[in-house]
Each structure stands twice: as C-alpha cells, then as structure tokens.
Amino acid sequence: PEYYLTRSDWVLLFLGLKNKKVIFECHQYSRIRRIILKLVIKKKNVKIIFLNQELLRHSKFTNTVSNKLLVAHNGFDEDFISKGPINNGGKIVFVGSLTRFNEDRGIKILIDAFGNQEIKNQYSLTIVGGPEEEALELKKYILSNNVDAEINIVGPKARSEISKYLRDANIGILLNTSLNIHSYLFSSPLKYFEYIFSQLKVLAVDFPAHRELPYSENIVFFEEGNTDSLIKAIKNTSNVKPLQSDDVKTLTVNERVKKIIEFANS
C-alpha cells in the first residue's frame, strides 16, 4: 500500500524501523507509546495523527517535525443520523456508556439538577446507555431520592435506534470524570459530533478536551460535580442557537478521511 494506517504501537515500531510509509493515529498516551513515538518520528516515512490539540501539545515534538503531524478530531457518520430534528424545547438527552474506563461518569448530577423546581418544570431528561446494571442503579437513585421529574432511563440501545432519541431532543450533554487523564485532556467524543449534526445545543463538563472541540464557543460549560453550575448552564442554553447543517458539513467521517489522504500525500 501507499501508506499503512495503524493505532498499534508495535506495528508502528516495526514498520517505522523498516522505513515503510506509516501513519499512526494517537488517541492517548502510555509510557511505551511515548518512547516509541520519540524513536520513530525521526524516520522520514512516519507521520502521526493526533485526536486533539492537547495530544499534540503533550507530544512535545519540536517544529522541525511539524509537517509530519496532524490534528484530526472525530467526525460523524452521515448514514447514521437522520437529518431534520424535531427539536422539542426543553428536552435534554445523554447518549453513551454510563461508565468510562470502569469509572463513574458522574451521571447522577443530571438527576440532582432536577431537584430544582424551575428545571423540573421546564425540562425533561432522557438517558440512553448501559451497561444495564448501571441503568438500573440510576432508576434506584431516582426512587431513593424521591425525584419527581420527567426522567427516562432507557438503558442500552442498538446504534440503529439511537438517532430517534437525538431527533426528539434539543439539548445534548457531554459528561465524564477528571479522574482519567484521557477523558480530561485527550478525548474527542463521537457523541459531540452526533449531537451537533442533529442540531442539538450542547452542554459539557468544563474539561480542556471539550474546550478543544470544533465550535466549542457554542458549547455551554459547567463545573464538574457542581449541581448549581449545571442548573445555571441548563438555563443558559436558552441563549444559544444550535449549529446548522452548513456549519458542520466539514466534520463528517468522509471529510476526515479526505484530510488524512491529503496529509499522507503532502
């Protein structure tokens, strides 16, 4: 092939040392990966793609190799999402795994926010994702805390079913834990791109990784673990206009592939 594209450290090392043309996608770091990257970046046929700007910064590569480095965020699959959202006012949705690297994502703060009378009266919440036992725990949490609000915990759903939940909402939320450096600094959540392509407003916990996302100036941020900050952010979504399809047309998976091909040929 013209270029090998890999996310394997060992494939990168083997091909790089053989002077094969190889592009490595870097989504996070390990001690071994840092050693390998430092070694192979000296090879003329090695190029590296970083999932976000923070990953590039933490590589500590100098400007002498900048032509071999590319930042390419995730993108959305146009075949997955039905365009033309219903955009019902006041409907918040979270879609994704309820845990991250076996750690709590902080989902319960969403439920806590509905203890606020204004939020309870004006908004509803749908949480789509698993595992099933975590979804069950959230249902128990609602009951044990006597949360009398329109909150729907639907559990894990097939990918083919998720688009209907996006179309029936107008606010999407990004949650994660700062206990994991990947979540805090290096992620480029696929769900974000699906949210904005579905023309949802976006709420996000205030992490550097989320600040690096395309159109992050349109995200309403809140402080991790702070219910009052989340409540304020939910209310502030009324001041935000969702992105339109023309705004995000360059953020598709197909456009990402084109960018990578251009990078390979540069």
What are the language-model segments listed below?
Residues 170, 197-199:
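A short alpha->beta transition loop at the rim of the catalytic pocket in nucleotide-sugar-dependent
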Residues 49, 76, 85-115, 125-126:
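Conserved donor-binding/catalytic core segment of Leloir-type glycosyltransferases
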Residues 233-240, 250-266:
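C-terminal alpha-helical cap of glycosyltransferases
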Residues 101-105, 160-162, 172-194, 204-212:
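Nucleotide-sugar-dependent
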Residues 14, 31-34, 42-81, 212, ...:
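A short, active-site helix/loop in glycosyltransferases that binds the activated sugar's phosphate group
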Residues 129, 136-166, 171:
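Nucleotide-activated donor-binding/catalytic signature segment of Leloir-type glycosyltransferases, i.e.
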Residues 5-11, 26-27:
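Short His-centered aromatic/hydrophobic patch
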Residues 216-227, 234-239:
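Conserved acidic donor-binding segment of nucleotide-sugar-dependent glycosyltransferases
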